Amino acid sequence: MLKKLFHSALWGLAAAGVILFAVPRLNNSNIFTSDDIISFKNAVRIASPAVVNVYNRSFSSASINDNDQLQVNNLGSGVIMSKDGYILTNKHLIQNADQIVVALQNGNIFEASLVGSDDLTDLAVLKIRADNLSTIPQNSARQAHVGDVVLAIGNPYNLGQSVSQGIISAIGRNAVGDSVGRQNFIQTDASINRGNSGGALINSAGELVGISTLSIGKTANEIAEGLNFAIPIDIANDVLRKIMRDGRVIRGYFGVQSDISSSSEEGIVITDVSPNSPAAKSGIQVGDVILKLNNQEGISAREMMQIIANTKPNSKVLVTILRLGKILQIPVVIEEFPVN
């Protein structure tokens, strides 16, 4: 028995010697070259100069006339959207601020003015007096997809600019947290902590994908992990343009709701009509199926919402519906979306 064991051990040692001779010694060599390292440093290098720190400062109640007593009430991030100083951030960050301070990554500090804000998307537009600022490239032809690698850039807990990495977990999320369902959120597992809000969500090419907004975190009974959300850049750009033009976002209002799961191939099934809304005033009913808006057919409920939102108040829209087997055309006068 011992002799067999001895021979087995010898064979094992011999085999090990052959393997060690044939395979390079891993402990003394790096099997990866520098070209093999997966890195997003170029994306970060492109985008990070355009991500700023945003500070909400307010007077303390004891010394309202003493500038030295301005205290930071809230902090977050922002994204420079134009070379002449327009910045997107979150509205909740600058709510009730006596002073808004923006710190660039090159160390320059500016007092910012509030151009306007939007409750429905929790976005705000700031302006600083500066020129030739860095911006993040955008690519409207590139669609965001579930599984895309994304990077969140911001100032978590005022530690300084930081980058977290994840993927797009879902797109088209609505009614998240306390939101009112118009954001069409991008969901990601890239960390968005306190201070990241208002910062940039970019793809691996360094292109702006969205504006980081919120994270679902600790509750009384559980901890949510990897549930972070951003406003898609197309919606953010639309809000930016409207606020720069009008100082606020003016949306059209129709006053219907549709459950996507109950919509048919023919059209959009109306599941609720708000009282005193334009839809109610024109006779739209629950159960009606919207086939067309003006001459546009085959649209989704989300597309309908966007079309109505971009329709000027007091404009007339011709709605083609299917009701109990009959096709009807109903004119609807669009009103301004009620903010409250």
Curated annotation (Swiss-Prot):
Residue span(s) of domain PDZ: 251-323
Free-text note on domains in this protein's UniProt record: The PDZ domain probably binds peptides ending with C-terminal Tyr-X-Phe sequences, which activates proteolysis. In the absence of OMP peptides the PDZ domain inhibits peptidase activity.
Cytoplasmic topological domain residue ranges: 1-4
Role, per record: A site-1 protease (S1P) that cleaves the peptide bond between 'Val-148' and 'Ser-149' in RseA. Part of a regulated intramembrane proteolysis (RIP) cascade. When heat shock or other environmental stresses disrupt protein folding in the periplasm, DegS senses the accumulation of unassembled outer membrane porins (OMP) and then initiates RseA (anti sigma-E factor) degradation by cleaving its periplasmic domain, making it a substrate for subsequent cleavage by RseP.
Catalytic reaction list: Acts on substrates that are at least partially unfolded. The cleavage site P1 residue is normally between a pair of hydrophobic residues, such as Val-|-Val
Gene3D superfamilies assigned to the protein according to its UniProt record, in alphabetical order: 2.30.42.10, Trypsin-like serine proteases
Note from the entry: Regulated intramembrane proteolysis (RIP) occurs when an extracytoplasmic signal triggers a concerted proteolytic cascade to transmit information and elicit cellular responses. A membrane-spanning regulatory substrate protein is first cut extracytoplasmically (site-1 protease, S1P, this enzyme), then within the membrane itself (site-2 protease, S2P), while cytoplasmic proteases finish degrading the regulatory protein, liberating the effector protein.
Transmembrane found in the keyword field: yes
EC code: 3.4.21.107
Transmembrane segments: 5-24
Localization terms from the record: Cell inner membrane
UniProt keywords, alphabetically: Cell inner membrane, Cell membrane, Hydrolase, Membrane, Protease, Serine protease, Transmembrane, Transmembrane helix
Annotated active site: 92 (charge relay system), 122 (charge relay system), 197 (charge relay system)
UniProt name for this protein: Serine endoprotease DegS
Taxonomy of the source species: Bacteria, Pseudomonadati, Pseudomonadota, Gammaproteobacteria, Pasteurellales
Annotated family: Belongs to the peptidase S1C family.
GO MF: serine-type endopeptidase activity
